[in-house]
Amino acid sequence: MNGTEGDMFYVPMSNATGIVRSPYDYPQYYLVAPWAYACLAAYMFFLIITGFPVNFLTLYVTIEHKKLRTPLNYILLNLAISDLFMVFGGFTTTMYTSLHGYFVFGRVGCNPEGFFATLGGEMGLWSLVVLAFERWMVVCKPVSNFRFGENHAIMGVVFTWFMACTCAVPPLVGWSRYIPEGMQCSCGVDYYTRPQAYNNESFVIYMFIVHFIIPLIVIFFCYGRLVCTVKEAAAQHEESETTQRAEREVTRMVVIMVIGFLICWIPYASVAWYIFTHQGSEFGPVFMTLPAFFAKTAAVYNPCIYICMNKQFRHCMITTLCCGKNPFEEEEGASTTASKTEASSVSSSSVSPA
């Protein structure tokens, strides 16, 4: 084996030289240089100072402006809450442990850190699935006369919490476990070992199928159908200027949504699956650290994609930040009017983002 397995940890380095130490008790500077941990801490600090304001502002603006309290925005707020879970439950802890070069909170602290990071990520992922499903139902109309209401939104929020818990809770109760990963200063699901007492193998397979493959299929299907529907609507209206604009806006939004999902999850999932299916293979600590920490950027670009591209929300946000006035009032007003015209042209009030 090219790694060292200990009590509730796996260090990706052979202990043939005897230098490997528990990541709960000793700095792991034999894995990578101290400056690498400092860079990791700086990166987490950047995510904190950007992720917290933009997600908190999302919550505040929605509460401040009554017109934003729509059923669909319940899901967007849930997305912001999930990102805040990642910021407070994962990013702050990881920044602190990175400054010390090891997981200073010990085995007791590894469980809550891994839990909150996993819960926040899964809440965000399943919120995207609910958004994709809502867009498909409203725009493509597979069920005639369907209107996305408050009850549907509440059901969607409850669904995201339920699915997130079905992934984050099992490692706390004995189905798999949370252990330090990569550079040993953050905790995640154990892809590295297969102790019979924890049934890691069955949990990882379950997680990849239910919490990665299925969401990916749903998102691709829903947004694929949405783009096709908008194209068909544009053709039926003889491709008027407003319809073409609507098609471009929706297509751009969908492409960014899908790319964001892929960029966030595929590198991490691919590396985790490789490690899981190549037990004992040689890989360095950075091999898992880079995709794992890159996936955390979802807490920053999620609100940018799903909220900042929403004209109405952007207008309210600028108004809030500028003490009740929007210096871009004319531009925003024209955009809002155009958006309404475009929505009418494609026979759906929900074609433009949210």
Swiss-Prot record:
Lipoprotein among keywords: yes
Annotated glycan sites: 2, 15
Disulfide bonds: 110-187
Motif window: 'Ionic lock' involved in activated form stabilization: 134-136
UniProt topological domain (Extracellular) ranges: 1-36, 97-110, 174-202, 275-286
Species annotation: Carassius auratus
PTM characteristics: Phosphorylated on some or all of the serine and threonine residues present in the C-terminal region.
Membrane spanning stretches: 37-61, 74-96, 111-133, 153-173, 203-224, 253-274, 287-308
Region of interest (Disordered), ranges: 333-354
Low complexity biased stretches: 334-354
CC terms in the record's Gene Ontology section: membrane; photoreceptor disc membrane; plasma membrane
Lipid tethering residues (S-palmitoyl cysteine): 322-323
Cytoplasmic compartment spans: 62-73, 134-152, 225-252, 309-354
Subcellular location: Membrane; Cell projection, Cilium, Photoreceptor outer segment
Membrane topology: Multi-pass membrane protein
Chief location category: membrane
Protein name according to UniProt: Rhodopsin
Highest rank taxon of the organism: Eukaryota
N6-(retinylidene)lysine PTM sites in chain numbering: 296
